[in-house]
UniProtKB/Swiss-Prot annotation:
Matches recorded under SMART domains: FHA
Name listed for the protein in its UniProt record: Kanadaptin
Chief subcellular location: nucleus
Taxonomic source organism: Homo sapiens (Human)
Composition-biased stretches (Low complexity): 27-43, 699-708
Length: 742
């Protein structure tokens, strides 16, 4: 004890004197690896800062803690340490050693290991690790690999190499590199997984290391023997194996698994294996007392055992709906909101477990409600597929469908008294629609209007009831309260709170229905056609028609064959234009004449209508004698002498006309035609008016009056014939076709 006290006193004096010493300069990594252990550092302080090596039971890392100093001999501790920490001077204070002490199993790497630095998809550089025991990563300049990212700690992590034993052998943990996090703030990531602090994690060739939030990736390169072997198990099998390991570990931690049970299990396995080996012989494919597999009852499960999820993974809702249809049940999803955009979906399956309870498939999903429904359907399909019920034939498992009609389309669990949402009635209506009890007819404008009227009527009735009940409640009763209550109950004027709430809810539903119906009515409303208003011309035309009906149909005037309608009735039509000689057809056209012709035609139509009215008024004023039909037909026929005389006279006059005197001669021609009057007075009046009109409408030298073809009615002004220009026949050919031969 005296020796120990004396040593502690000497160490304390050394610490006091060491505070006034000059701090040591930073040493380069190469020189530091070769430099011997400095004796000026205090081993107790180093021992306090150095972490204890912890072992992860699941990752298979080394379970060798750093050596604990013996209070009796500090010199032996310094000799055992192969790599003591080197003090690194900080810019703002005295020298500070890294908080890491190399374990005794560490040693320099003899294999050609290297560390590649990758950033942005390109390799920035390669650092050789051959001959180094460990590599220190951090933000300080004294670290082996200096990182400038602000999320990297000053001393962040260490890549420690484990050397093999002296005889070339090693422990259960093989030689290689191990990653050790020095309790950094933002952590160290190995293959995108954050490793626990102060724990050695094995790093194989090809593994990727990242420090904090830095984007630089460090890839370990080395011999192929150190590369991690790929597992033959799938991801799901690895997850199941991991779960089993965790369960066994929990049992061991809780002490549930005793050594006796393990011994019993191992003994039973040995006995079973020995009996099987002893009884092994020719069994002809049939074992004695063989237990039939449950899967033999369902061959479809064996057929699709390797591809189970391929049957329903694309559309789980459809597969689950098909199962419920075969079972004769209704598929209903239940939703519970667990939090913000987090849904718990639940489906009750028509299958019982071994204890007789109904199986329920549940799924929690963060996102949309529809996605939670799909996840729940997928989980239900997996449960049913595990039981071998999802892909069975409909004949083998189909149950008898419920006869909803016997129960008035209500379920046995439905209770309308406790229902406040109206969901049960909606389900009942849907069942009735599926059964065909409710005929859905297409809505029309009339049906929508009728529904809107009914909704408005019901809405007004409910509002009146609510108003009356509120008035009764507001009025203070003069009589006894009990008598007033009994009278109100008999009259039914007052409403209790539940009925008032129901009426308010019904009012809200009716208003929504009213808005919906109004929107539909706007869509299907027929087009509004404005009413026809009678104009003055239509009224006068109707009066004239009524007057004409009272007149006789023939014998109105002589020479009526010219004015015979297509229907055979006698009437008045516009006058026929005379046929002009072909000499006038060869005259040149002038553009101004066309506008004058249109104006003159309009004036002619107005005058003709005026003459029609005058003639009708004259015929109504004087009575016309009745004429026999034969005489009327003879009078309606035009005299042939008169027409022949007109044609000859016009041809003679037109042949003698010159270009300068055409206007004057044409007026004389119209006078001669007007002098040749017929025997009747009406014919003379008509010819006079026609001559006056032709005087005003005398064509100029370049004007071409239109000619009528015999194919169309000559006495109908609605028809006109197009006349081809000079030198053309109307078939599209001109003199250029003949000239150039095309």
């Amino acid at each position: 004890m005296a020796d120990i006290l004396s040593q502690s006193e000497t160490l304390a004096s050394q610490d006091l004197s060491g505070d006034f010493k000059k701090p040591a300069l930073p040493v380069s990594p190469a020189a530091r690896s070769k430099a011997p252990a400095s004796s000026s550092s205090n081993p107790e302080e180093v021992q306090k800062e150095g972490p204890t090596a912890l072992q992860d039971s699941n990752s298979g890392e080394p379970d060798i803690p750093p050596p604990q100093p013996d209070c009796g001999d500090f010199r032996s501790l310094q000799e055992e340490q192969s790599r003591p920490p080197t003090a690194v001077s900080s810019p703002g204070g005295p020298a500070r050693a890294p908080p890491y002490q190399e374990p005794p199993w560490g040693g320099p790497a003899t294999a050609p290991y290297s560390l590649e630095t990758l950033k942005g998809g390109t390799i920035l550089g390669t650092r050789s690790l051959k001959g180094t025991s460990y590599c220190l990563f951090g933000r300080l300049s004294g670290c082996d690999v200096c990182l400038e990212h602000p999320s990297v700690s000053r001393y962040h992590a260490v890549l420690q190499h484990r050397a093999s034993g002296p005889d070339g052998e090693c422990d259960s943990n093989g030689p290689g590199f191990y990653l050790y996090d020095l309790g950094s703030t933002h952590g160290t990531f190995l293959n995108k997984t954050r490793i626990p602090p102060r724990t050695y994690c094995r790093v194989h060739v090809g593994h990727v290391v990242r420090f904090g939030g830095s984007t630089r990736l460090f890839i370990l390169q080395g011999p192929e023997e150190d590369r991690e072997a790929e597992s033959e198990l799938t991801v799901t099998q690895l997850k199941e194996l991991r779960k089993q390991q965790q369960i066994l570990l929990e049992k061991k931690m809780l002490g549930e698994d005793s050594d006796e049970e393990e011994e019993m299990d191992t003994s039973e396995r040995k006995i079973n294996a020995g009996s099987q080996d002893d009884e092994m012989g020719c069994t002809w494919g049939m074992g004695e007392d063989a237990v039939e597999d449950d899967a033999e009852e369902n061959p479809i499960v064996l057929e699709f055992q390797q591809e189970r999820e391929a049957f329903y993974i694309k559309d789980p809702k459809k597969a689950l709906q098909g199962f419920f249809d075969r079972e004769g049940e209704e598929l209903e999803y239940e939703f519970d909101e667990q939090g913000h955009s987090t849904w718990l979906c639940r489906v009750r399956l028509p299958v019982d477990d071994s204890t007789g309870k109904q199986l329920v498939a549940e799924a929690i999903h963060s996102g949309k409600k529809k996605e939670a429904m799909i996840q729940c359907s997928l989980e239900a399909c997996r449960i049913l597929d595990t039981l071998g019920l999802l892909r069975q034939e409909a004949v083998s498992r189909k149950r008898k469908a419920k006869n909803w009609e016997d129960e008035d389309f209500y379920d046995s669990d439905d209770d309308t008294f406790l229902d406040r949402t109206g969901l049960i009635e909606k389900k009942r209506l849907n069942r009735m629609k599926k059964a065909g009890k409710i005929d859905e007819k297409p809505e029309t404008f009339e049906s929508l209007v009728a529904k809107l009227n009914d909704a408005e009527r019901e809405l007004s009735e409910i509002s009146e009831r609510l108003k009356a009940s509120s008035q009764v409640l507001s009025e203070s009763p003069s009589q006894d309260s009990l008598d007033a209550f009994m009278s109100e109950m008999k009259s039914g004027s007052t409403l209790d709170g539940v009925s008032r709430k129901k009426l308010h809810l019904r009012t809200f539903e009716l208003r929504k229905e009213q808005q919906r119906l109004k929107g539909l009515i706007k869509i299907v409303k027929p087009a509004e056609i404005p009413e026809l208003k009678k104009t003055e011309t239509q009224t006068t035309g109707a009066e004239n028609k009524a007057k004409k009906l009272t007149l006789p149909l023939f014998g109105a005037m002589k020479g009526g064959s010219k004015f015979k309608l297509k229907t055979g009735t006698v009437g008045k039509l516009p006058p026929k234009r005379p046929e002009l000689p072909p000499t006038l057809m060869r005259m040149k056209d002038e553009p101004e004449v066309e506008e004058e012709e249109e104006e003159e035609e309009e004036e002619e139509k107005e005058k003709e209508e005026h003459e029609k009215k005058k003639l009708e008024d004259g015929s109504l004023s004087r009575p016309q004698p009745e004429i026999e039909p034969e005489a009327a037909v003879q009078e309606m026929r035009p005299p042939t002498d008169l027409t022949h005389f007109k044609e000859t006279q016009t041809h003679e006059n037109m042949s003698q006309l010159s270009e300068e005197e055409q206007n004057k001669d044409y007026q004389d021609c119209s006078k001669t035609t007007s002098l040749c009057a017929g025997p009747s007075a009406s014919k003379n009046e008509y010819e006079k008016s026609r001559g006056e009109l032709k005087k005003k409408k005398t064509p100029g030298p370049g004007k071409l009056p239109p000619t009528l073809s015999s194919k169309y009615p000559e006495d109908d002004p609605d028809y006109c014939v197009w006349v081809p220009p000079e030198g053309q026949s109307g078939d599209g050919r001109t003199h250029l076709n003949d000239k150039y031969g095309y």
